[in-house]
Swiss-Prot record:
Documented effect of changing C402A: No iron-sulfur cluster formed. Low activity with cobalt-factor III as substrate. Normal activity with Co-precorrin 3
Species, as recorded: Priestia megaterium
Gene: cbiH60
Gene Ontology MF term list: 4 iron, 4 sulfur cluster binding; heme binding; metal ion binding; methyltransferase activity; oxidoreductase activity
Protein name, entry field: Cobalt-factor III methyltransferase
UniProt keyword Ligase present: no
Family: In the N-terminal section; belongs to the precorrin methyltransferase family.
Length: 540
C-alpha cells in the first residue's frame, strides 16, 4: 500500500490564518513531522497522530524520515510555518524523493498545501510595503553559502527591490544582518523605511517601524522578519507604504483623483509621493541647457570621486534614487465651437510634447497630451499663448459642442460658453459628457452623450441618460422640450451638481439616472433596447 506525503504550510501560526485544506490535511494524516515549535503551534488541531519533532537545523533528517514513513504506507504531514514552498520543507522532500528515484506516477503520492508566507503576513501588519517588485532573502547560511547570500543582497539593493529578510539572526548567527545592513546602505538612503515583525499573528507579536540606519538598535531574532523598503517607500500614520509604480500622472486642476478599479495606481492616488518627486528632462531648450550643465557637473564629480577611490584603494557605490517620473496630462482644443487648428498651434504642440511625450486625438474633439515634466506651468503658459482651450482629463465634466455650422448658427454659443465657465473640468464620480448641438439636425450627436441639449426653434430640448458604449448603446431619454434659453444653463447646472453629490464612485450617469429614478424633477424611463446582450468585460 502506497502512503502519502502532505507538505503543509500553516501560515503565521494563528488558527484564523490556517487554510481549510491545511486543517483537513492535518486531520487526515497518521503522522506529523516538524520542528518542535511548529508542532506546538498546531497542537489544537491534533487528535491521535503520531508526532516526530526535531530541532531547528534538522530539516534534512525530517524530510528523510517523512519519505521513509510514507513509503511504509502512512499518510505523513510535514509541516512548515508560512508557505511550505517558501523556505519550507517542500523542496527538501522533493530532493529526498528524487535521490531515491521517485516518479510521480508510481511513487508515493505528494501534495504541497500552500500557506500564507511571512512576507505576506508581515506586510499586512506593516501596511502595504510590498506593492511593487520585491524579493525574499534568507540570511541563514545553514544550507546556502554566505558568499552567495551576499551577492543576492547586493543585486537586490542595486535593483531597488523591496527586500524581506527571513531568518535574520539566531543565538549563534549574528553578523549576517549586520552585513546585510552594510550592503544596503551602499545603495539606499539611511532613512529608508524598515519594518520589523516578530511572531506575526501569534501571542508575542511585535511590530516596529524604524529605518535602515537604526534597525540594528532594535531586537531582531530568529522569529523576526525584516522588511526593507525601496526608494519610494514611506511611512504614514504608523504604516509602511510602497507606491505601485514609479510613474505618476496629474492633470490641470487636481492633486488627487478617484482611482478607477481597472487602472493601475496613478499619481492622483499617491499624494504621499510628492516629496520624492525628481525632475525629468524637459522638452524646452532652456530646460535642456540647465539639465546638460547639471549632467556635466555630475560627470566631473564622478570622475573626481573615481580618482579618489583609486588612490585610497576603496570602492563605494552611489545611493540608488529611483526617479519617480511625473506625467502631466491635459486635453487641448481650439475652442468649444471652433474645430480648426492653426499652424502655430500645431507647431506649439510639437514643441511642448517633445520626443518623450504623446499626443492622442480623442472622440471629444480634443487632443490629449501626456508630457513628462516637473514644470507644468511652463507648458500651460505656452499652450495658452497659442490660444488653446485647456481641460483636465479623467473623471471630469467635458462639453462636446458642435461647430454651429462654422458659427453661422450661433444662438446657442453663449450658453455653451457659460456652461464651460461654470462647470468645465469639474470633478465627477465618472467622466461626464455634455453634448450641445446648435440645430435640430443634431449632426454632432448630442443626444448620444450622457446629457444632451439641442437648440431648436429658439429653445432647447433636453436629453438625459444616453448609454454611450456597448452593443446595447442608446440615445438619451428626451425629458423636456422647448426650455427657454434663459433657463437652460441653470437646469443643466443643477442636474450636474446633483449627480456630483449623489453619484457613486465610478457610476456612469445613465446608471445613476436609472438608480435614483428622478434627477432635478425629471423622471427616469427605461428606453433600453429589449434585446439580450452579453455584458461588456469592462463592466460598462
Amino acid at each position: 500500500m502506497k502512503g502519502k506525503l502532505l507538505v503543509i504550510g500553516f501560515g503565521p501560526g494563528s488558527f484564523e490564518h490556517i487554510t481549510q485544506r491545511a486543517r483537513e490535511a492535518i486531520q487526515e494524516s497518521d503522522m506529523i513531522i516538524g520542528y518542535k515549535t511548529y508542532v506546538e503551534l498546531i497542537q489544537g488541531l491534533l487528535t491521535n497522530q503520531q508526532i516526530i519533532s526535531t530541532g531547528m537545523t534538522e530539516e534534512v533528517s525530517r524530510a528523510q524520515e517523512a519519505v521513509k514513513q510514507a513509503e511504509a504506507g502512512k499518510t505523513v504531514a510535514v509541516i512548515s510555518s508560512g508557505d511550505a514552498g517558501v523556505y519550507g520543507m517542500a523542496g527538501l522532500v522533493y530532493e529526498v524523493l528524487i535521490e531515491k528515484g521517485w516518479k510521480k506516477e508510481t511513487g508515493v503520492e505528494l501534495e504541497v498545501i500552500p500557506g500564507i508566507s511571512a512576507i505576506n503576513s508581515c506586510a499586512s501588519l506593516l501596511g502595504a510595503p510590498v506593492m511593487h517588485d520585491a524579493c525574499t532573502i534568507s540570511l541563514s547560511d545553514h544550507l546556502t553559502p554566505w558568499e552567495l547570500i551576499e551577492k543576492r543582497i547586493e543585486a537586490a539593493a542595486q535593483a531597488d527591490f523591496v527586500v524581506a529578510f527571513y531568518n535574520p539572526k539566531s543565538g549563534r548567527r549574528t553578523r549576517q544582518i549586520v552585513e546585510a545592513q552594510r550592503i544596503l546602505l551602499k545603495y539606499r538612503s539611511p532613512d529608508t523605511p524598515v519594518g520589523l515583525v516578530k511572531s506575526a499573528y501569534r501571542d508575542r507579536e511585535e511590530v516596529v517601524m524604524t529605518n535602515l540606519k537604526d534597525m540594528l538598535n532594535h531586537e531582531i531574532g530568529m522569529l523576526t522578519t525584516v522588511v526593507v523598503g525601496n526608494s519610494s517607500t514611506f511611512f504614514y500614520d504608523d504604516l509602511m507604504i510602497t507606491p505601485r509604480g514609479y510613474q505618476r500622472k496629474y492633470t490641470l486642476n487636481q492633486t488627487e483623483q478617484p482611482l478607477r478599479p481597472h487602472q493601475r495606481l496613478r499619481k492622483e492616488a499617491e499624494p504621499w509621493a510628492l516629496d520624492q518627486e525628481e525632475a525629468v528632462k524637459q522638452s524646452a531648450s532652456a530646460i535642456e541647457a540647465v539639465q546638460n550643465t547639471r549632467e556635466e557637473t555630475a560627470a566631473s564629480r564622478a570622475l573626481a570621486e573615481e580618482a579618489l577611490q583609486a588612490i585610497l584603494g576603496e570602492s563605494t557605490s552611489a545611493v540608488v534614487h529611483q526617479p519617480i517620473e511625473s506625467i502631466f496630462e491635459v486635453a487641448v482644443s481650439p475652442g468649444l465651437a471652433n474645430k480648426k487648428f492653426t499652424p502655430v498651434q500645431m507647431t506649439t504642440l510639437a514643441e511642448v510634447v517633445g520626443e518623450k511625450g504623446t499626443m492622442e486625438y480623442t472622440p471629444d474633439h480634443q487632443i490629449k497630451l501626456q508630457i513628462p515634466t516637473a514644470h507644468p506651468d511652463m507648458i500651460i503658459e505656452k499652450l495658452q499663448a497659442a490660444s488653446f482651450l485647456l481641460s483636465p482629463v479623467g473623471d471630469v465634466f467635458t462639453i462636446k459642442a458642435c461647430d454651429f455650422c462654422d458659427g453661422e448658427k450661433s444662438d446657442a454659443i453663449p450658453h455653451t460658453e457659460e456652461l464651460q465657465k461654470r462647470l468645465g473640468g469639474m470633478d465627477m464620480p465618472k467622466e461626464l459628457k455634455l453634448g450641445i448641438n446648435g440645430c435640430g439636425m443634431a449632426c454632432y450627436g448630442a443626444v448620444q452623450e450622457d446629457i444632451g441639449i439641442v437648440y431648436r426653434k429658439g429653445a432647447f430640448d433636453l436629453f438625459l441618460g444616453a448609454k454611450t458604449v456597448g452593443r446595447n448603446a442608446h440615445s438619451g431619454q428626451i425629458v423636456a422640450e422647448g426650455i427657454a434659453p434663459d433657463d437652460i444653463v441653470e437646469i443643466v447646472e443643477n442636474i450636474i451638481h446633483e449627480y456630483k453629490e449623489k453619484g457613486h464612485p465610478n457610476e456612469r450617469f445613465h446608471k445613476f439616472f436609472k438608480r435614483v429614478k428622478n434627477v432635478y424633477g425629471f423622471d427616469y424611463q427605461d428606453i433600453t433596447p429589449k434585446i439580450k446582450v452579453e455584458p461588456a468585460p469592462c463592466g460598462d
